[in-house]
Curated annotation (Swiss-Prot):
Principal place of residence: membrane
Catalytic activity of the protein: a C21-steroid + reduced [NADPH--hemoprotein reductase] + O2 = a 17alpha-hydroxy-C21-steroid + oxidized [NADPH--hemoprotein reductase] + H2O + H(+); 17alpha-hydroxyprogesterone + reduced [NADPH--hemoprotein reductase] + O2 = androst-4-ene-3,17-dione + acetate + oxidized [NADPH--hemoprotein reductase] + H2O + 2 H(+); 17alpha-hydroxypregnenolone + reduced [NADPH--hemoprotein reductase] + O2 = 3beta-hydroxyandrost-5-en-17-one + acetate + oxidized [NADPH--hemoprotein reductase] + H2O + 2 H(+)
InterPro entries: Cyt_P450, Cyt_P450_CS, Cyt_P450_E_grp-I, Cyt_P450_sf
Pathway the protein contributes to: Lipid metabolism; steroid biosynthesis
UniProt keyword list: Heme, Iron, Lipid metabolism, Lyase, Membrane, Metal-binding, Monooxygenase, Oxidoreductase, Steroidogenesis
Entry EC no(s): 1.14.14.19, 1.14.14.32
Name by which UniProt lists this protein: Steroid 17-alpha-hydroxylase/17,20 lyase
Keyword Iron: yes
Cofactor(s) needed: heme
Amino acid sequence: MKLCFFLLIFIRSFLLFKIKLVRTSEKKWRMGSRSHGDVKHPKSLPSLPVIGSLLHLGKKLPPHILFCNLQKKYGSLYSFMMGSHYVVVVNNHEDAREVLLKKGKTFGGRPRTVTTDILTRDGKDIAFADYSPTWKFHRKMVHSALCMFGEGTVAIEQIISREAASLCQTLTSFQRIPLDMAPELIRAVTNVVCSLCFNTRYKRGDAEFETMLKYSKGIVDTVAKDSLVDIFPWLQIFPNKDLDILRQSVAARDQLLQKKINEHKDAFCGETVKDLVDALLKAKLNMENNNSNVSQDVGLTEDHILMTVGDIFGAGVETTSTVLKWAVAYLLHYPEVQKKIQEELDVKVGFGRYPLLSDRKILHYTEAAISEVLRIRPVSPLLIPHVALKESSIGEYTIPKEARVVINLWSLHHDEKEWVNPHLFSPDRFLDENGNRVYSPSPSFLPFGAGIRVCLGEALAKMEVFLFLSWILQRFTLEVPEGDPLPDLEGKFGVVIQVKPFKVIAKLREVWKNIEIVT
């Protein structure tokens, strides 16, 4: 019976599709051609009715690797049909910068999917929301809040340093004992975000903290899976375990975040700003008072504040902790890099204090190593897809309205035309001949995206990665436990490129065994 029901649904959908078949076939023929009259479209993968190019995308390769490999046959800019959606893949920095910077507003849209609608209350966040007056007002409000509760201020540095100290205490207690650092790094980064957003931090075993970890894992695990329901939304009528888990996890997240926001609203006096939620409430209040007509027109609601905090947790914790895990993995593979970072810390910071954010301008090799981690293992190898809000072009090719544009950051960061031996981990590529920091040795280096859709948390992420790594390496040498293999550097594609689990031995450096710093 279930099979018959499925067939009936499929036939119904196919017949509905046939109504538009002539128009769609003509459109796909034009898109699949290199040129048609005066219009030139990117070369396209073969496509079939209903399923599009799915049969040609089903190889057992992660999407970023598959898209990179397809360049050999289709060029650095090509297209395919994902069901009924026209998708363009960008694999070079010239086209990527045109999309992100030169034509950022034109390609500023976001695709609506079943999964992201559940995750964002129908697009009320910043990362996945479509480009619109509401989105612009929302982003401006968040930027105002971040400035108010300052990126780069003493407050944020103190928060990160406190968690770095706590992390170092944990490593000290596990000296010479194999430790999976992943949970500790996640805990440290999560506490930074909790302190930033709610003026709260959690200890191990705290029930509320464990709830956060549980729903975060549920969201990450389900969103990471290839979901046919995002290609064929009508599949929602069938039981879907992953969607059920996602809905449950999002409900748990929203319940906790709403509780925190309500507590802040009750205590908020309009003047004192203790954390980011207070800053968001004040920024929203200020903008409504100063631009009452604008705020009413854009329809900014409390849901937008809740989703902003959800964005910060969802993106801020997963991405930053993953960068740190990759950094540790590569330092284990390249102990000479770890040693050079430690030597730089010894000379330029010394043993009488801990690293500060202001040291970034003198710790050139440390910063270069972090940049190389971001290059060789971009946390988000495929940036969140963009959508063309009107017909436009990329290079010499015409791009139709509503086309989805995917920037393959992996290809940009491993382009042999831009990087010498791109698969080799080499911090020196971010240094000049005098050992000074080169911030962007190639226009292909775009770890946080660019333009109007650039990651809002870029500054915070860079601060966290720098302070956590420099604090750890100042005091400890990281080694692979005896008999264990080196960490796997392939990773697993998902919401981010996940590091496969591995263990570390953190040895307190000899010079630090008799040193105590008064903070």
